[in-house]
């Protein structure tokens, strides 16, 4: 939904980085053994955190996000989604700290024409009565949707892909070469040659693009989630607590608590402190909850300007890229595929 067009490369976020790193309940963490590898990325992030660069990212993300739901609807017309997607909007709330950041986000969305409803404490309580009374105000985005079970939706789309003649091979790519400009993918014991190929491996894409001598500043924002089973009745829609950078979504599996940004690369182990942070934040929002389950770590592929990489390689005309969608990979999947396939087919 277009509400998500406000990027993280902002002057206010840049100024808050030191305090966020020092806060145990804050939205940002760093694996210190990974700091040397992150320095080039951080320097580029600083350069992209001016007001001008922020608005450049916001305007471009708004354009593609505006097309995201229609692209999903094209696919959803062909599968049975009963009970798997809900159209109840999304609610952002905050306390009385960092109000300037919230005002900036609202201002940017107003400039982009995003429909948003400012809500006071009484209206927040009417929308979500189980949230503890710690909040100052919020914004409600009525047209946002959320998935009750993303895995079930993905499997339905995968079945549709196979029915339409798609083929799937799960193999480790060891190297990419070229035969008369056609990409040749090498696995441990096989080779595959294609007219054109798309690298769409999320945060793992850099391992392949480096082999093609394209130094794309892709890294990963490590994100976490936990589930609280049989608690989905406590919320009607996703709720994001902006100050601490986490959200809670009611799903088939219960309440899914997601959030935080941890810089630490692909190989560092899961941080128990981040899991504890999510559990603590969930209880701060909703009070007593049962024992959590399903601790999970995922990798958000992010670039310093928070724009995705979509389009042909600069070095090889038959290689296309589609990665770097940071927090919006699920949201932007269908429209990104449509855009890149249009490029490959030489469509407008």
Briefly describe each language-model feature range.
Residues 144-159, 203-204, 274-281, 336:
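Mid-domain beta-loop-alpha active-site segment that forms a flexible
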Residues 38-156:
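Rossmann-like flavin
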Residues 4-48, 175-178, 182, 191-317:
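Active-site substrate-recognition segment that forms the wall
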Residues 119-130, 167-184:
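A conserved short coil-to-beta-strand element within the FAD-binding core of flavoproteins
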Residues 1:
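Glycine-rich FAD pyrophosphate-binding loop
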Residues 59, 118, 178-179, 307-348:
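C-terminal lid/capping helical subdomain adjacent to the catalytic/cofactor pocket in oxidative enzymes
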Residues 165-167, 255, 319:
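Short, conserved active-site loop motifs that form the nucleotide-linked donor/cofactor pocket
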Residues 74-86, 163-167, 194, 214, ...:
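Surface-exposed helix-capping loop/turn segments at secondary-structure junctions
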């Amino acid at each position: 939904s277009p509400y998500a067009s406000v990027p993280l490369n902002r002057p206010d976020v840049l100024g808050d980085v030191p305090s966020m790193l020092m806060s145990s309940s804050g939205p940002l963490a760093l694996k210190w053994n990974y700091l040397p590898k992150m320095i080039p990325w951080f320097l580029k992030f600083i350069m992209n955190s001016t007001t001008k660069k922020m608005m450049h990212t916001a305007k471009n993300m708004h354009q593609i996000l505006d097309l995201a739901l229609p692209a999903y609807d094209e696919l959803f017309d062909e599968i049975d989604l009963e009970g798997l997607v809900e159209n109840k909007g999304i609610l952002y709330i905050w306390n009385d700290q960092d109000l300037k950041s919230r005002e900036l986000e609202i201002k940017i969305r107003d400039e982009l024409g995003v429909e948003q409803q400012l809500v006071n404490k009484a209206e927040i309580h009417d929308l979500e009565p189980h949230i503890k009374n710690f909040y100052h105000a919020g914004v409600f985005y009525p047209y946002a949707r959320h998935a009750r079970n993303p895995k079930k939706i993905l499997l339905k789309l995968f079945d549709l892909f196979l029915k339409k003649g798609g083929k799937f091979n799960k193999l480790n790519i060891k190297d990419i070469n070229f035969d008369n400009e056609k990409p040749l993918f090498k696995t441990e014991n096989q080779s595959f040659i294609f007219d054109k190929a798309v690298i769409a491996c999320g945060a793992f894409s850099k391992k392949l693009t480096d082999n093609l001598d394209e130094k794309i500043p892709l890294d990963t924002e490590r994100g976490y989630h936990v589930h609280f089973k049989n608690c989905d009745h406590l919320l009607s829609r996703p709720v994001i607590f902006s100050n601490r950078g986490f959200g809670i979504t009611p799903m088939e599996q219960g309440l899914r608590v997601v959030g935080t940004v941890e810089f630490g690369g692909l190989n560092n182990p899961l941080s128990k402190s981040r899991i504890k942070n999510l559990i603590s934040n969930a209880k701060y929002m909703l009070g007593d909850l049962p024992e959590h389950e399903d601790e999970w770590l995922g990798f958000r592929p992010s670039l310093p300007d928070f724009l995705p990489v979509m389009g042909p390689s600069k070095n090889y005309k038959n290689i296309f890229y589609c990665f770097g969608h940071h927090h919006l990979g699920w949201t932007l999947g269908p429209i990104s595929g449509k855009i890149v396939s249009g490029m490959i087919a030489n469509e407008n």
